[in-house]
Amino acid sequence: MLDAYLVEIFDLLHAAYGPRHWWPAETPFEVCVGAILTQNTNWGNVEKAINNLKKEGLLSPEALRDVPADRLAETIRPAGYFNVKSVRLKDFVGYLWERHGGSLERMFAGEWRQLREELLRVRGIGPETADSILLYAGDKPTFVVDAYTRRLFAALGVVDPETGYEEVRSLFMTNLPPDVRLFNEYHALIVEHGKHHCRKRPRCDGCGLHLFCRTHAAERPAP
């Protein structure tokens, strides 16, 4: 059964890497900002941009609402696509103020599936960003899918590499209990495994999932 298989993969990843304690942030709002900044870049660049925001006193809904877009763009330059991302941050904060009075607590107080639909209507927020905000900032039981997820579970033969976001997400949402801590840890472990082994050019040596992996089986020499 797929539910038991997904739990087995989780257990193997957890045994290999231990608890990940993700998302690294001091506040839920910092998580939201990081979820937008991490689009099309690596986490190291996001950390530099967030540190800049902290130094400039800009890591709050009020500050991001009031800061000029050009100053914001320069502040988040390390995250890449800084002009685009400054607009996306402004759009998110504009939504937060217009719809929820600038309060994340109020935003997260409602039904989370409806909130997901609202977030997806904000320019620049796609499914991965919306689910990251909901799971990591709002403690809502939604599963985050990213390139690492697709690559790993395609290698395991569970999905096709071209399977769409919602279909992959549904696989986890349907076959795992709606547990925030489980979803949080599972996604973080997938990312960690993707960095170490299940890369675009796989590093199969030492991979704890090699017995399940089609990629490893294809590359293994014939007996």
What are the residue ranges of the model-derived segments?
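Catalytic cores of DNA base-excision repair glycosylases
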Residues: L2-A222
